[in-house]
């Protein structure tokens, strides 16, 4: 009879009403890293590192780039005959120059402060070319004979289009004194040059005067250049060299030229009609008939992510460049479907006492599963889920806003005398980049740890909310579930979920069932104790009889000698 009562009690326990606290799980394979763990699978995650580009040069915010193709900036500005397509160019968003363009200074020489001029172009978006000293305004000098085979055009000798190489006329080179006043509202970019002959014979052949100079002055410039006559190896078939200069002439300022030979005079100047953020980008790509907000030398980036690892040099509204291969923010929970056990988390909620996530609960992150005589089902706790979603969304947006500063990094150029500065600049930029990469990676690791612990704490809080309501009307099963000592229908289950559970209403029924179950356990325990004692005594008696019989047999056949001493 006792066994029947015990069996009935066990069956009753199995069939008791239950409510469990759990969390959402899905088929996601997304993984994140935290301070403590690597490759943690989560239900939801957000990638914040852009890794793709389109491999094209695009318009920047609707404005096309100026792609110089085989021409250099110097070849474009001076007017290399092979760069005639760039004699007049529209507004540009940025300038694209190849690493080693073939059409630069066709007549060999140097461009003074060339890197500074390129820096000026990084703040300029449109030039308007204007004539300041017409070619036919040199009656005492030859303005059309200054050509060279080094600058061919259609198989004939030619020269830079925007400057005039002045030669002697009728064996005379009268001293030049010319001025130009900037009456425009915009700054003017003016270029001129000086010719350095190969020997004295070439000097007199071209300019008649053996000793010459070129003097240029403005309100901010005072320059006097003297030709350097020297024997040099040939480049492009020329032993002579040309040196070009530039200056910015402010409105209402005047530039004065004076020379008695070797002067390469300006014919055209560039009016800076629009300033703005631009850049000179080194790239061999062609225009891809596309539009972007961020351009790199290897392709355009169209992304709202705050970071990228595509190329350190960018122009436009760009994410920050980092050296990382992966930066993923956790937004969801640890993805641990049932039948999978994970390590215990900080609060022991998701990865601790709860066995696994529920793929059947799809309308929330945290919630309940109940079972009673009316059936079973899942119900999400939408209030805690919404609070968590809002909190994590705000945090992710805050992180992205902090990182997503409009950022551009354009390469800087240095001349041969500034290599140490260039090396120092590169080391500093690499150092800053390493620090920024480390900070970004550390921030992601820390925030992922906090997010997962935040979810653990929310599940634990939901569990405690139920535990505090039920008190001793149910018992904890240790797996996130509670087993009732009373009947709990769907209305009762709903009251637990919304926090209105009436403890006194069910306490008497729960007490009686609890005492009945405890009594059954005590009675069954007494039966087991009696059986245990009986079994022990019987076993000991049987063992003693066996030992006595063995001893008697051994004594009777002489195997064992028995002596009784008094």
Swiss-Prot record:
Record note on quaternary structure: Homotrimer of disulfide-linked HA1-HA2.
Signal peptide range in chain numbering: 1-16
Residue ranges that the UniProt entry lists as topological domain Cytoplasmic: 551-566
Protein's UniProt name: Hemagglutinin
Keyword Transmembrane appears in the UniProt entry: yes
Keywords: Clathrin- and caveolin-independent endocytosis of virus by host, Clathrin-mediated endocytosis of virus by host, Disulfide bond, Fusion of virus membrane with host endosomal membrane, Fusion of virus membrane with host membrane, Glycoprotein, Hemagglutinin, Host cell membrane, Host membrane, Host-virus interaction, Lipoprotein, Membrane, Palmitate, Signal, Transmembrane, Transmembrane helix, Viral attachment to host cell, Viral envelope protein, Viral penetration into host cytoplasm, Virion, Virus endocytosis by host, Virus entry into host cell
Purpose of the protein: Binds to sialic acid-containing receptors on the cell surface, bringing about the attachment of the virus particle to the cell. This attachment induces virion internalization of about two third of the virus particles through clathrin-dependent endocytosis and about one third through a clathrin- and caveolin-independent pathway. Plays a major role in the determination of host range restriction and virulence. Class I viral fusion protein.
Annotated compartments: Virion membrane; Host apical cell membrane
Name of encoding gene: HA
GO biological process: clathrin-dependent endocytosis of virus by host cell; fusion of virus membrane with host endosome membrane; fusion of virus membrane with host plasma membrane; viral budding from plasma membrane; virion attachment to host cell
Its membrane topology: Single-pass type I membrane protein
Organism, scientific name: Influenza A virus (strain A/Turkey/Ireland/1378/1983 H5N8)
Gene Ontology cellular component terms for the protein in this record: host cell plasma membrane; membrane; viral envelope; virion membrane
Glycosylation positions in this chain: 26-27, 39, 302, 498
Site positions for Cleavage: 344-345
Topological domain ranges for the Extracellular compartment: 17-529
Family: Belongs to the influenza viruses hemagglutinin family.
Keyword Lipoprotein in annotation: yes
Superkingdom, taxonomy of origin: Viruses
